[in-house]
């Protein structure tokens, strides 16, 4: 079984229907044009993802998370992944402000769901249900992903709000397990979400690196401490 290495993670298959997901210290932005390494980033993303998966599981949302397998490793259920990214937006930011005549920071009257085709060569283009069908993803599967994505949003938006954080937007990925269930996969971390401090509107996510807003590790550590109630130990 081959090890897959992406920009931010290694996927190491095991022979018991499980996978090791190893988080790297690498940071990339703008489709890999900007790159750097930050010691401790992998640990922070692994621990934040594990914590948020537990929050979702406690709310009845099925994920691929099984447990923590070391500082920067999670054990997860092996899934047959869909070639899609599902983006949920609560506040105008990022690419959305270029597509709608709304100011950055405007709270949306309801969440916006977007689908993107995962393909680096094509720049991960936005697609609709017709494109998805051509890619082999049925309408019922899309509706199930959308339903779960909105459930995730309801749980996490409330969870973060209680901790003084705005969940601006986030990316999810889904796969199908051996029982034919559509399950939340990948990660939920400041690499894949936009988090703003509710008072200052400071970024607590990868935008800190993307736009040179400050120290990435400090931002991730602040997020970790807010959501877990524990001070992180520098790695």
Swiss-Prot record:
CDD domains: SAICAR_synt_PurC. The keyword Cell membrane does not apply. GO terms for biological process: 'de novo' IMP biosynthetic process; cobalamin biosynthetic process. This is Phosphoribosylaminoimidazole-succinocarboxamide synthase. Pathway: Purine metabolism; IMP biosynthesis via de novo pathway; 5-amino-1-(5-phospho-D-ribosyl)imidazole-4-carboxamide from 5-amino-1-(5-phospho-D-ribosyl)imidazole-4-carboxylate: step 1/2. Keywords: ATP-binding, Ligase, Nucleotide-binding, Purine biosynthesis. GO terms for molecular function: ATP binding; phosphoribosylaminoimidazolesuccinocarboxamide synthase activity. Its EC number is 6.3.2.6. Belongs to the SAICAR synthetase family.
């Amino acid at each position: 079984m081959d090890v897959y290495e992406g920009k931010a993670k290694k996927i190491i298959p095991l022979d018991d229907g499980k996978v090791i997901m190893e988080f790297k210290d690498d940071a990339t932005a703008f489709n890999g044009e900007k790159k750097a390494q930050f010691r401790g980033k992998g640990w922070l993303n692994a621990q934040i993802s594990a914590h948020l998966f537990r929050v979702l599981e406690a709310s009845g949302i099925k994920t691929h998370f099984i447990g923590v397998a070391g500082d920067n490793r999670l054990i997860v259920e092996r899934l047959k992944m869909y070639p899609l990214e599902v983006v949920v937006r609560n506040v105008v930011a990022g690419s959305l402000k270029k597509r709608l005549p709304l100011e950055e920071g405007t709270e949306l009257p309801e969440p916006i769901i977007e689908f993107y085709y995962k393909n680096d060569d094509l720049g991960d283009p936005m697609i609709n249900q017709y494109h998805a069908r051509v890619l082999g993803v049925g309408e019922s599967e899309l509706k199930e992903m959308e339903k779960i994505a909105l459930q995730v949003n309801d749980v996490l938006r409330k969870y973060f709000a209680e901790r003084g954080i705005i969940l601006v937007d986030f990316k999810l990925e889904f796969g199908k397990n051996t029982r034919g269930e559509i399950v939340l996969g990948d990660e939920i971390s400041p690499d894949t979400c936009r988090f703003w401090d509710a008072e200052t509107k400071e970024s607590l996510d990868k935008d800190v690196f993307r736009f040179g807003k400050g120290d990435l590790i400090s931002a991730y550590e602040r997020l970790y401490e807010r959501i877990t109630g524990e001070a992180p130990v520098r790695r």
